[in-house]
C-alpha cells in the first residue's frame, strides 16, 4: 500500500480537534468554503457531499480518490468518515440517535481483494484507525441538496 500523503492531509491531533471544534453548531452550508453546494446547484442529491465538505472545507484537504486512508494524524494513517445522525425511526428504540444510512468503509473489488492479505489490505488499513464526524440531520426524511443548508 502506498503511503504518500499530500501535505494538506497531514495533521496533529490538536489541529484536527481545533478544526472540527470550530465547525460545531454550524450548518454544512456555513462551513462550505470550497463552495461544493454552489458547484452542485440544481442537482437533487449528491452522494457524499457532507463528507466532501468536512474533508475539503473544514480540514482543508485537496480532493483525491485514493484507496488509502484519508489523513495522517500524529503519524497514524486515519480514515475519515462523515455521517448524518437522526432521531431513531422506531419509537421504542433505546438509542437517542442513529445513523441516517449505512456507512461504506471502502469499495471492494473481488479481483483485487482475493490477492490481498487481510493485515496489509486497503480494507484493514482504513478500518484500523477511523475518525468519525457526525452531523445532525434534522429532517426525518431524505431531503434534496438545498435541505442540507439548514
PLM region spans:
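Nucleic-acid endonuclease domains
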Residues: 1-76, 82-150
Amino acid at each position: 500500500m502506498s503511503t504518500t500523503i499530500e501535505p494538506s492531509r497531514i495533521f496533529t491531533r490538536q489541529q484536527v480537534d481545533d478544526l472540527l471544534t470550530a465547525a460545531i453548531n454550524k450548518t454544512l452550508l456555513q462551513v462550505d468554503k470550497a463552495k461544493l453546494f454552489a458547484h452542485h446547484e440544481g442537482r437533487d442529491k449528491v452522494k457524499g457531499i457532507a463528507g466532501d465538505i468536512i474533508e475539503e472545507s473544514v480540514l482543508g484537504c485537496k480532493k483525491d480518490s485514493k484507496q488509502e486512508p484519508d489523513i495522517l494524524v500524529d503519524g497514524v494513517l486515519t480514515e475519515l468518515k462523515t455521517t448524518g445522525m437522526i432521531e431513531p425511526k422506531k419509537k421504542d428504540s433505546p438509542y437517542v440517535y442513529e445513523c441516517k444510512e449505512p456507512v461504506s468503509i471502502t469499495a471492494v473489488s473481488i479481483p483485487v481483494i482475493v490477492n490481498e492479505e487481510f493485515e496489509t489490505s486497503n480494507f484493514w488499513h482504513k478500518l484500523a484507525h477511523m475518525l468519525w464526524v457526525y452531523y445532525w440531520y434534522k429532517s426525518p426524511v431524505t431531503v434534496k441538496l438545498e435541505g442540507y443548508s439548514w
